[in-house]
Amino acid sequence: MLKIAILGRPNVGKSSLFNRLCKRSLAIVNSQEGTTRDRLYGELHAFGVPAQVIDTGGVDHNSEDYFQKHIYNQALTGAKEADVLLLVIDIRCGITEEDAHLAKLLLPLKKPLILVANKADSRQEELQIHETYKLGIRDIVVTSTAHDKHIDTLLQRIKLVANLPEPREEEEEGLEELSVDEHEESEAALPSNTFPDFSEVFTEGFSPEEPCTIPESPQQAPKTLKIALIGRPNVGKSSIINGLLNEERCIIDNTPGTTRDNIDILYSHKDRQYLFIDTAGLRKMKSVKNSIEWISSSRTEKAISRADICLLVIDATQKLSSYEKRILSLISKRKKPHIILINKWDLLEEVRMEHYCKDLRATDPYLGQAKMLCISATTKRNLKKIFSAIDELHHVVSNKVPTPIVNKTLASALHRNHPQVIQGRRLRIYYAIQKTTTPLQFLLFINAKSLLTKHYEYYLKNTLKSSFNLYGIPFDLEFKEKPKRHN
């Protein structure tokens, strides 16, 4: 995979360029210096080959700021990792001492290096290009990311210095045909006007004691799982990422709000790829005092929507806060499978460990039957178990429960606990199917919705949850009345 690193001093437009290249707003763009702190990764789809763009934080080697040392190291790591380097400067300011320092730092790496003279918003500013020659960089492209000027020229230059081949026409046509075919695929809809009579389906041919097993789906190439790490500031999300990857990819500090961007990190483990989304901590809106914090908070909500599975990280040494309850509510509303990671487990006393999880489940209804994993990012206790927990949860979500097993399970539930009689009638379930996988939903055909009580609906839902191991997987039951026959 071709990797392209964007480097430069603070506030020259690196994140704006990153967003232009990736065609979506991944990096936070703001006039405040130091907005980007960690390395951000995005996909570039312009060359016909897999390509990745790395956005690094603004470098100021003379600064004594605590974060600058980490940002500097992150930028150097990104430069060493990349195949092509883009040094971004602000053409309106001329060549600064920091620009010259970065050029001297990058030239000895002997990698393709392009100087991006950004913020050339007018023709007069474009003519200042002669100032840039003193840096000793041969390839120079003048751009204005604010006005989307000359981005195509930059892409062509990247393609040239990276020696990328021209895509063959046959391959492009094949890709177009494939995408058209995929859009034409659709699931057959259930008939809404006629249903077979399954009145006896729950009274014959089953054994309540017989265990249900879900057959696995046919083997397919494993998809890249998008995993969002969610939690309030300073609970250890970035430490968990660094522990899983065995390298410092996220800047860690005790100050809440160290992570500002959502950081996409692609990682391979046992033949499967995981895209970890390390999010900025979610806060109450009234405590968000500036635009950067507000954008970070909204990005956390977007990360939940993007993710296949959410990992909610909580601090074992602190009580469950209203922030975490809000996150749990968001995850549930988005119908996202999730796992609760209880971090800083090493700091708990043994006496508290025995009752902690039980007490925690009692604090919020969403935690009642969620999957929990006690970990320590500091000692790396149970960190590797996170992968197996994710895989297990994904396996349950991606394997559709066969219709006969759904019906058999519900038949057993009715056999154990009969619905109550309401006005001389009793609820009957004729037939049931798993309607969708993501989000998970079951469709039950019944005789009358007026005979279904909330209590019995809750009982049916718990039966399906325990039978098919749906813990940590929000799902819905949809009830549909069977049309009455007309003679």
From Swiss-Prot:
Residues 168-187 have a biased composition (Acidic residues). It comes from the Bacteria. Belongs to the TRAFAC class TrmE-Era-EngA-EngB-Septin-like GTPase superfamily. EngA (Der) GTPase family. GTP 2 binds at residues 231-238, 278-282, 343-346. Transmembrane segments: none annotated. CDD domains: EngA1, EngA2. One of its GO terms (biological process) is ribosome biogenesis. GTP 1 binds at residues 8-15, 55-59, 118-121. Residues 2-166, 225-398 form the EngA-type G domain. It comes from Chlamydia pneumoniae. This is GTPase Der. InterPro entries: G_ENGA (IPR031166), GTP-bd (IPR006073), GTPase_Der (IPR016484), KH_dom-like (IPR032859), KH_dom-like_a/b (IPR015946), P-loop_NTPase (IPR027417), Small_GTP-bd (IPR005225). Residues 399-483 form the KH-like domain. SUPFAM superfamilies: P-loop containing nucleoside triphosphate hydrolases. The keyword Transferase does not apply. Associates with the 50S ribosomal subunit. Residues 165-194 are annotated as: Disordered.
